[in-house]
Amino acid sequence: MFARPIRAAARYAVLIIGIAAVSTLAAQSSSAGWNPQEILKAEGFVKPPADVEKLIVTPRTDISFTSPSPDRSWFLRAAGMDRGDILAYGKPHIYLGGVQVDTAANRARSVTTSTKSALTLINPLTGATKPLEVPKGASVTGQSWSPNGTQVAYIASFANASYAYVADVATGKSVQVSKSPLLATLVTSIEFTADGKSLIVVLVPEGRGAPPTHGTGGIEDGPTVRLTNSRAVPQPVHASLLLDPHEKAQLKYYTTGQLALLDLKTKLVKKIGEPRMIRAVDASSDAAYFRVTQMTEPFSYLVPASSFGSVQELWNANGTVITKLATTALREGAVDDGDAPAGFGRGGAQPATDTSKRNINWNPVGPGLVYVQSVFASNGSGAAAPAGRGGRGGAGGRAGAAPARAQATSVRYLSWLPPFGAADTQVIYEGGPALGTIAYSADGKTMFVADSGSVFAIRTAEPTKRFNLGRGVTLAAGSGGGRGGGGGGASAGGADTSAAGGALQTRRGANGQSFVVVGTDGKSVALTGTRTPGANWSTQAPRPWLDKLDFESGQRTRVFDSPADGYDEFVTPLNDNYSQFLYTHESPTTIPDVWLKDVTANTAKKITANVDVGPELTGAIVKRFQVSRPRDGNKMWVDVTLPKDWRPGTRLPGIIWFYPREYTTQAEYERSRFTVNINRFPEVPSARPASSTKIWVSQGYALIEPDIPIWGDSGRMNDNYTRDLRENLDAVLDAVVEAGYVDRDRMGIGGHSYGAFGTMNAISLVPYFKGAIAGDGMYNRSLTPFGFQSERRSFFQAQDTYLDMSPFFRADKIVTPILMYHAWEDQNAGTAPLSATRMMAALQGLGKNAALYMYPYEDHSVATYASDLDLWARWFAWFDLHVKNAPATKKPIP
């Protein structure tokens, strides 16, 4: 609890805590000058073999189309490096309850570390590009379109400040809107007002004074103090919790900003209200009112800032609070919440009848606000609660001691008009007790309502007339208000929406609101879905589709259908009639590209030119098969990737890379495979090494990626963890050896995060791996006493299981050379760097063969080129020494 986390970036080289004696056998060089032993000893950043470095640093082609202009004539794309710059990541920063702050620049660290430095417009009809000017030396984030599509606003971040800029689409030129620096700590984007004349921003307050200090000379003025007050507050192990009153003061200082409007014509700044700890801002269409969500005190030492309380208020243009819309209390947990895992509470008791205003949003097709409100028969008259009532406190959800909840008889959808008094409400629609999402067409003539398992289209001029859109049709949450995302349209994801279902397509309108796309005939909507193969996933791929539906007649027309031998996925329409739209096409041998489909002309044209950066990997040989373990016949799937020039009869050094998961039955495990897509192209991602594992085959290794299911009774699967882990790995190893892919005497094992945990467990249980790699893992489960991963029991409820699963307590049994890596600033719950340093201390004390590399400035996985390249260098050096060139196991003399 009192361990002080790394608070600022202050380490400038990779720290090697220990390298035990290694084999004197020299590893065969993967490239000229490659010396694994020197690589492992180096105390600065190093690089892998040249061909591996090329795979990592070669820029990937961005083919995304996610940010359309309101008329969809252009798409906006931010461009830059695929990985981060160590100089940006190393810039001084602090952690305050999980909020990462670049204190010199008054912004979130994520803004500072943005890799984007350019803005480009793409013509969706031709693929032609047009650059937008960005100031030299700036990174860009938070970009958004103006309502009429003639301008793009963005945050330009420099070394010590961020500013609002606007680019003109016609000329490509950018101008700085104001010299006032932005406070981009909690609010990291900027938006236009609905009339396009101003920007809504949060600024650094004028005259706010110097940052808080501990006291005279910055000297700590007392001990860190904690009192339980005999209150049970079980929590997962959070990173970077607030430590003391000084950090509370810092959090308040760096999150308190001034809401303002920046006039694009005059460049004048209009301040709105007093500075507050603003989390989010949403303006009415006329910018006369603002929904302002603020973080509230008290702060807590027990939970991160994301669990701190908040209040949402309605402000007028002068910053006067008109009314309080919603309040959320500090959420530290409640031990009597039976539904919360391991005592993770949900905010205390709730009233038996909730008649508060919920889902408050700006009316997308009219003035004022809209909200929903439940009606209960127990109210006597059945009338809704008074319109002026504010939102309830607490975090929502049930509590164990809550009174029995009455069943709502109906749910009303109401408008709330200025000046937002108690009598300024009007019922728009009244539905059943299961009334869900409500959305509109852009012209406001049609309302779409999800109610009691169906979606209805309702003419606003004839609210009693409803058209049922059919079985299985869905309307995504969030479609009915609030400022949407990029506007590419909702998708059905991996759900099986094969027959008469589908997800209604939405897009972002000129006012920033999300609307259901309705054709120019006023009655046609688009639905997307995916036919999933279910149990046939290993031979058939998911097949996305797009239908047009005449909701008055019920007639459906298939517009787009993915072929069986490829994977085509709808991206976005270019008009409301869906006569032109973009989609991606790929196959196991065809890299993804975006195509323009013209339905009227029945033509398709490729408009992007994606590049395969690693044909030696994308052309690798992949074998997929099932393995049965002898004890009970339970089966698991295994993928083996072999170099493209591999020939049968050649046994390679092998690497098992895995991530265990828990299941109650074989059938449940099999269902988890249903989302596998056999028609995907095997691209080489630019992301962290742990997700780019196919790079192993570039150096002559066989990569084995098995599922490692842990089976058991619900809530008790981990009681079988070590048994299943050992038996599953035995079965996998036997299978890949018997298939002739690998040499049993040259096998390594590795994993990241929970896979690292599994790896350390594996080498503490079995002796036959020649080398191992474990990164960002937790190796002592007594350090996560109130649950981890899918384990919901506490250490005190399942002590034997926690201890049995902790490889730290079997460190003396480890004989496999183990390379650990960990990020110094790992913010993932339950994988503190302490885990790696303590495990290393144990291995050092026991004289085991181990190495530890601690990466500065990095989080739960490396994000910079420097760390990425360094990791691959150390990985290859370790396995080249211990696995690829491992001496043959001596067979006993008969």
List PLM regions with ranges:
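Beta-propeller folds
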Residues: R7, Y12, I19, L25-T603, ...
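N-terminal hydrophobic alpha-helix used for membrane targeting or insertion
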Residues: I17, A305, L846-N849
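Serine-hydrolase catalytic core recognition
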Residues: A287-A288, E297, G348, R358, ...
